[in-house]
Amino acid sequence: MTDNAPTSGHDLYTTAGKLADLKDRYHEAVTASGETAIEKQHAKGKMTARERIDLLLDHGSFVELDEFVRHRTHAFGMEKKRPYGDAVVTGTGTIHGRQVAVYSQDFTIFGGSLGEVAGEKIIKVMDLALKTGVPIIGILDSGGARIQEGVVALGKYGEIFRRNTAASGVIPQISIICGPAAGGAVYSPALTDFVIMVDKTSQMFVTGPDVIKTVTGEDVGMEELGGALTHNKISGVSHYLASDEPDALDYARTLLSFLPDNNLAELPVFESDVQLEMSDADRKLNTIIPDSPNQPYDVKTVIEHIVDNGDFLETQPLFAPNIVVGFARVEGRSVGIVANQPNAMAGTLNIEAGEKAARFVRFCDAFSIPILTLVDVPGYLPGTDQEWTGVIRRGAKLLYAYAEATVPLVTVILRKAYGGAYIVMGSKQLGADINLAWPTAEIAVMGGQGAVNILYRNEIKAAEAAGEDVAAVRTRLANEYTYNVASPFLAAERGELDGIIEPAATRVSITKALRALRTKRASLPPKKHGNIPL
C-alpha cells in the first residue's frame, strides 16, 4: 500500500466498510515485512521486533503507538516501498503489572535503519515515558542511519541522544542489543543505565572492521571487535551477556523488579519473612574468613548469606571481576551492593573496578536505592600501566560517587581496608551512615608486611646479622603491627566504626541499619551540577 486508498473493494461510505478497511490495514501493519524476511530473521537465530515485545511484556498488555506511520522519502526509489511502521515498533505495556514504554527496531524492514519517521516514533515514545515517569526499554537491531535520508536521519539520532540525557537519573533506561548497532547508533545505549547483549548475535562498534582494515591495516572480525563477549569482558559497555534473546529479555524483566518507576517513586516492596534471630545459616559466616590474610574467598558467598533468599542479581559480572556490584533485597526492599572480590586480583582496586563501581553507586543514588558496601581491599593495583592510563583521575570517580550520594549508606569491613582504598570504599569520612566491621577487619595505612619493611627495617637487618630466621621475624613483626595498629577496635575507639559485630550477626545488623535509615534526609549544596573527574 503506497497511498491512503484501500486495496480491497470495501465500501468506505459505510461503517462496516471502514471497519473492514481498518482491519486490513492493521493486518498489513503487523505483517509489513513479509514472511520471507521473517524467515531470514529466524534463520539467524533472531526473533522479530514484535516477538521480542511479546516476550518482554506481560501477556496482552502491549498497546502499540504509531503503527500506521510511513516514511516520507522519495529519493532513490523509496516512494515505491512505504511499509507501515517504518522499521520500529513502539508502544507501552506492563512488566510484572508495572507500566513501561518500549521500542523495538525491526530488522526485517529496511534493515532496521533509522530514518526521519522511525526516529520520530522513538522520540515520541521516549517523551511519553519521561512525561509519565515510567522506565523505557529499547530493543536495538539496526543497520544504523538510513543512508537514503542523509542528514535528516542523523539529526534524529541527536534528538534521541538529547532525550537519553534528559531522562538520565529520572527514569530507568535499559537497552537490549539483539543485532547490530553501529556508528552513531551505539551512543544511545551507551547513555542508558543498563545494556544487555546477546552472545554471538549482537555487535556494537563505532567503526566497522572494513573501515578499520582500510585506515589502519588491522584485520579484526565483527565478533572480536564489538561482539557481546568483548563488551561484557573487555570494554565494560555491556552489563549482562545473555545466552539468547529470551535470556536477555528475562534479565531485563528481573532487573526492573529492583528498580522504581522514576526518581520520585517509591522502591518496589516484596513480601518478606525475614527473622531477626540469628540462624544456623548466619553462623556459617563465622568461618568464611581464612586465617591467612593472603588466602582468598568468594565475597558472593557473603552476599548470599545476608540478602533475602540468597538472591543476588549481579551486573557486569565479567568486567572488572575484582569488584562485585548488583542488586538484592533486604527485608523485601531493594539494595545496591558493592563488594571487593578477594577471589580476583586479591580484591585490589584498579581503573576498571573504580569506574564500574562509581557508575553503579551513582545509579543507585539517582533512584534512591540504599547502598551496602562490603570491604576487603588491600589497596590500589600498582604499576605504570595504571598510573599512565589515569588511575588518579579515573580512580577519583568512585570517591566522588560515594561522597555525593545522599541515599542510605551502610558499610561492613570484612577483612582488609588499607590506605586510600579504605577511604574510597564507603568510609565514614565520605559520608557513610552506618559503618560496621568484623573482628577480622584490618584498618591501616598499609598491610603488616609492607609496614614491616618501613617501620622495622633495623630489626630485620639485626635479625639477618644474627643469623635468625628472617621470615619468622617478619611474620612476628607483621602480626604485632596488625594487632597494635590495624585492629578494628582502634577505629571503633575513635568513632570511625559504629560497631564491631561477629560475622553471623551481619544479616540482622544490616536489616536493622536499613530500617533506621529509611527516613534519612540529606541534600547537597545548591548547584547546577558537579564536575566529576570524567
Segments predicted by a language model, with ranges:
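Ligand-binding clefts of soluble mixed alpha/beta catalytic domains
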Residues: 1-534
